[in-house]
């Protein structure tokens, strides 16, 4: 699908931006695809750029993603934690798997969802082929990743890690109200005014 172009006029000059570059001017990053290495590189680059522009000002990460690669998602997660700019997260559509972890990883009090979005958490999965010893190595790595992801989710939600481990054994779907109760988000927004009021509190 072609990327929309936005024309801005100032004085006698005009400037054309693709829509994502224009949103970046307002410190908005849109994660609207499955998460892979290429997507993670783009998101990380935008986070680092916006931090360099103003390390104290909020960055807004809008998430509509079914999840994807754990290692790619962790690159985004670690960058969010590394930079000094607070990262506000907002789920529109869905935040599933690694998308849900990134949603929960937003700055405290700045994690939101729109009213008809959905959130899903589960354990990492992987299929392996090859010699039995190689399969065993990969299986142990998946268990290590699973434990690490459970600890991260528990830290950001305030849930006991044992509950997170139980809940992620299978796909666990939540609406915004359930996600708020779980601790993945802090508020449900129906309009931009809600976000402004939350920031003012």
UniProtKB/Swiss-Prot annotation:
InterPro entries, from UniProt? ClpP, ClpP/crotonase-like_dom_sf, ClpP/TepA, ClpP_His_AS, ClpP_Ser_AS
Return one GO MF term. ATPase binding
Give the residues annotated as coiled coil.
none
* Keyword Hydrolase included in the entry's annotation: yes
Q: Which reaction does it catalyse?
A: Hydrolysis of proteins to small peptides in the presence of ATP and magnesium. alpha-casein is the usual test substrate. In the absence of ATP, only oligopeptides shorter than five residues are hydrolyzed (such as succinyl-Leu-Tyr-|-NHMec, and Leu-Tyr-Leu-|-Tyr-Trp, in which cleavage of the -Tyr-|-Leu- and -Tyr-|-Trp bonds also occurs)
What keywords would UniProt list here? Cytoplasm, Hydrolase, Protease, Serine protease
List locations, semicolon-separated.
Answer: Cytoplasm
- EC? 3.4.21.92
Transmembrane stretches, start-end: none
Family of the protein in this entry: Belongs to the peptidase S14 family.
**Subunit field text:** Fourteen ClpP subunits assemble into 2 heptameric rings which stack back to back to give a disk-like structure with a central cavity, resembling the structure of eukaryotic proteasomes.
Name of this protein: ATP-dependent Clp protease proteolytic subunit
Q: Which organism is it from?
A: Nitratidesulfovibrio vulgaris (strain DSM 19637 / Miyazaki F) (Desulfovibrio vulgaris)
Task: Show the taxonomic lineage.
Answer: Bacteria, Pseudomonadati, Thermodesulfobacteriota, Desulfovibrionia, Desulfovibrionales
Q: Which gene encodes it?
A: clpP
């Amino acid at each position: 699908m072609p990327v929309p172009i936005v024309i801005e006029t100032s004085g006698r000059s005009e400037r054309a931006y693709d829509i994502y570059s224009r949103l970046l001017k307002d410190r908005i990053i849109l994660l609207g695809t499955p998460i892979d290495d290429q997507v993670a590189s783009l998101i990380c680059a935008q986070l680092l750029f916006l931090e360099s522009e103003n390390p104290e000002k909020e960055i807004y990460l809008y998430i509509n993603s079914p999840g994807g690669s754990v290692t790619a998602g962790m690159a985004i997660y670690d960058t969010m934690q590394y930079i000094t700019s607070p990262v506000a997260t907002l789920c529109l559509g869905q935040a599933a798997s690694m998308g849900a972890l990134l949603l929960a990883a937003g700055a405290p009090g700045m994690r939101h969802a729109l009213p008809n979005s959905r959130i899903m958490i589960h354990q990492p999965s992987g299929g392996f082929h090859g010699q039995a010893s190689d399969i065993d190595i990969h299986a142990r790595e998946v268990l290590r990743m699973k434990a690490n992801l459970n600890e991260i989710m528990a830290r950001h939600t305030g849930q006991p890690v044992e509950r997170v481990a139980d809940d992620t054994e299978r796909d666990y779907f939540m609406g915004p109200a359930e996600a708020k109760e779980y601790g993945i988000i802090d508020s449900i927004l129906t309009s931009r005014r809600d976000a402004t009021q939350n920031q003012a509190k």
